[in-house]
Swiss-Prot record:
One of its GO terms (cellular component) is cytosol. The keyword Lyase applies. The keyword Amino-acid biosynthesis applies. Pathway: Amino-acid biosynthesis; L-tryptophan biosynthesis; L-tryptophan from chorismate: step 5/5. It comes from Serratia proteamaculans (strain 568). The alpha subunit is responsible for the aldol cleavage of indoleglycerol phosphate to indole and glyceraldehyde 3-phosphate. It catalyses: (1S,2R)-1-C-(indol-3-yl)glycerol 3-phosphate + L-serine = D-glyceraldehyde 3-phosphate + L-tryptophan + H2O. This is Tryptophan synthase alpha chain. Keywords: Amino-acid biosynthesis, Aromatic amino acid biosynthesis, Lyase, Tryptophan biosynthesis. It comes from the Bacteria. GO terms for molecular function: tryptophan synthase activity.
Length: 268
């Protein structure tokens, strides 16, 4: 959890926001997936948000669903994903690493065992996309027990009670939804979110990172101007993988360009 605090402190002192890319572990195959993650870090990613492939990803649009299918086609398993996470942590010791996933994968070997394994491989945070705050108690208790930050989604229509609960129980960062619906770049991020950001700050929430529909530098700047601490981009990155995975060198070059341009927008 401390890695997020250290990151946000460093960015604040540099007057920068955070740029956080999302990719699915094992997409398009384990070896290339690790190269992709190294490329994201080298191009300027401030933290990583990583998915474990899941067969029924309710919160995801077609782009990220396709990423899971590519990973499955290459034989990726949850066990292998944790081995990859350990390798990523070893290579990038100070980088905050978050998982964005679904409850079935947490239940598979038991909630406590899941968070224990996260701690062993150096994961900093876990966001479970299909567990609403009201059902989160056993997950967040296990997370805290093992030193993992429980991440909560703040939807655009959050009422005051939910904002207080998220602020009280969330750690690491707060996932601020640009809009309702599933992930994807087809629906652009909708702003402003000033009122939510102001309330989260008033209730001492973990710093908000805006996600869903973030695909261009102007949207990163808009998120920061609305008071967010940074932005998360998933579908736009996964689309680059989808369109270029048969040409790895071209894919890595395009990913590096995209991330460096998005990161540059956090300094504007």
């Amino acid at each position: 959890m401390e890695r997020y605090q250290q990151l946000f402190d460093r960015l604040a002192s540099n007057k920068e926001g955070a740029f956080v890319p999302f990719v699915t572990l094992g997409d398009p195959n384990p070896a290339l997936s690790l190269q992709i993650i190294d490329t994201l870090v080298e191009a300027g990613a401030d933290a990583l948000e990583l998915g474990i492939p899941f067969s029924d990803p309710l919160a995801d649009g077609p782009t990220i669903q396709s990423a899971a299918l590519r990973a499955f086609a290459s034989g990726v398993t949850p066990t292998q994903c944790f081995e990859m996470l350990a390798a990523i942590r070893q290579k990038h010791p100070s980088m905050p690493i978050g998982l964005l996933m679904y409850a079935n994968l947490v239940f598979h070997k038991g909630i406590d065992a899941f968070y224990q394994r996260c701690a062993e491989v150096g994961v900093d945070s876990v966001l479970i996309a299909d567990v609403p705050y009201e059902e989160s108690a056993p997950f967040r208790a296990a997370a805290i027990r093992h030193g993992i930050a429980p991440i909560f989604i703040c939807p655009p229509n959050a009422d005051d009670d939910l904002l207080r609960e998220i602020s009280s129980h969330g750690r690491g960062y707060t996932y601020l939804l640009s809009r309702a619906g599933v992930t994807g770049t087809e629906s652009r991020a909708q702003l402003p979110l000033h009122h939510l950001v102001n309330k989260l700050r008033e209730y001492h929430a973990a710093p908000p990172l805006q996600g869903f529909g973030i695909s261009e530098p102007a949207q990163v700047r808009d998120a920061l101007q609305a008071g967010a601490a940074g932005a998360i981009s998933g579908s736009a990155i996964v689309k680059i993988i989808e369109q270029n995975h048969t040409q790895p060198a071209e894919m890595l070059t395009r990913l590096a360009t995209f991330v460096s341009e998005m990161k540059a927008a956090t300094r504007a």
